[in-house]
Amino acid sequence: MRLLVSGKKDFSEFLNSLARRGESGFAKKEGTVRRILGAVKKDGDAALFRLTREFDGWRPSSRSIRVSPGEIRKAVKLLKEEERDTLEFAAERIEKFHLLQVQKSWSFADEDGTILGQIVHPLERVGIYVPGGKAAYPSSVLMNAIPARVAGVREIIMACPAPKGYLDPVVLAAAHIAGVDAIFKVGGAQAIGAMAYGTQTIPKVDKIVGPGNIYVATAKRMVFGEVAIDSIAGPSEILIISDGSGEPSYIAADLISQAEHDEQAAAVLVCTSRRFAEEVRSEVGKQLDLLPRKTIAGRAL
């Protein structure tokens, strides 16, 4: 992890490069993503299956690309008690939070009898994209599916890349707990295209939500208008500002928690004490040694 001091040349150079790091990413991927989306829109399942073979290394069919009820039951049975408790605890907290955000229809009649108001109607079908190529993200399942369910969305489908046809059981269990209606083993721009346009197997949705890599983000940007989207999320980033009085191990853990998502992630600490910065850097090194995703986090840091 680099240690930079304000006032020196390399400090301003680093800040400028950090600010520009996402500027050209979308443009470089647009051609590839446009071809993928066009193929899925034109050829449906045939293109989807071909792209899945190419990128995820397995041969799906209209039956195997959808997670079966038996696979979900098996995943739930494989959960350790601690994992189940953690997922259910998180799900309960997320639901409580979003219940307070629920909007309701309302109306009133003004002085001349004109009725004014607002009708709040949930979407029919929402598609959730959950990353899964390099790690499992059950939190992404809960944080996207539960708000949709609370809002009253009629049908929630989920797409998640499955290298060699494998999906992490914890992700499947999280989808079960969150009330996801259908899960598809497909990722990347092709998954976004399938949910945006619909195929013979995957239904068209009204809105696509959830994070992903640069190809997923570019695809979401390109299908916006065909469907609604939540946002165009770039690589993970975190900036911590400290006066040097915090706990170095906590700050190191927060930095690593974002750095492990992606080699392109940005994890930055700004503080007024060089001694404290060095303590945090030392702690980052110690914690990295214990991390299964040490290589990815190390590259980001």
Which role does the model predict for each range below?
Residues 179-266:
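Conserved NAD(P)+-binding/catalytic subdomain of aldehyde/semialdehyde dehydrogenases
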Residues 108-173:
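Conserved small-residue-rich beta-alpha loop and adjacent elements
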Residues 143-146, 172-175, 200, 224-226, ...:
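Short, solvent-exposed amphipathic alpha-helical segments in soluble enzyme
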Residues 168-179, 196:
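N-terminal small/polar loop signature for handling phosphorylated ligands or for N-terminal nucleophile
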Residues 267-301:
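NAD(P)-dependent aldehyde/semialdehyde dehydrogenase
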Residues 1-124:
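N-terminal Rossmann-like NAD(P)+-binding subdomain of aldehyde/semialdehyde dehydrogenases
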